[in-house]
Amino acid sequence: MRALFLLAALLISLAAPARAADDVAAAQGVIRSQVEAFSRDDAAAAYSHAAPAIQEIFPQADIFMSMVRNSYAPVYRHKSFDFGEARVADSTIVQRVHIVDAEGIPWEALYTLELQPDGSVKITGCVLLKAGQPV
């Protein structure tokens, strides 16, 4: 019985990092898909990755895209977009992204994403800072 308990504890401890890695991979896939939609000017696809709370603030895909173009130009159009450090806490994923905008200026984006009740991952926010600027 004790051996069974130890085996169960070991399996649980090994599953947590694997789940976190799966969550990060899913989050990166969502971010990548949204950025690709921005590059195609596909408002519907980009909007589909926004969490319900974001969709409440921006009730139509074209309104959402206008906000991104005006407030998140380095995310909307860039020379490079590379994933950095990620953290997982409960159902929230925080993903750092290193961006070089169309003019060659480096930026850091801090994305937050949440696991949804249906199992999908949606973007709940993005903070954009010039590289080296304190958070």
What are these regions (language model features)?
Residues 5-15:
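Bacterial N-terminal signal peptides
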Residues 9, 35, 53:
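Generic anion/oxyanion-binding catalytic loop in active/binding sites
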Residues 12, 50, 127:
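Short, histidine-centered active-site or binding-site loop motifs used for metal coordination
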Residues 16-40:
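Short, low-complexity N-terminal intrinsically disordered segments enriched in polar/charged residues
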Residues 25-29, 43-92:
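Short solvent-exposed beta->alpha transition segments
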Residues 40-43, 104:
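Alpha-helix boundary/capping and short turn/kink residues
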Residues 85-135:
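Exposed beta-sheet edge and beta->alpha loop/turn motif
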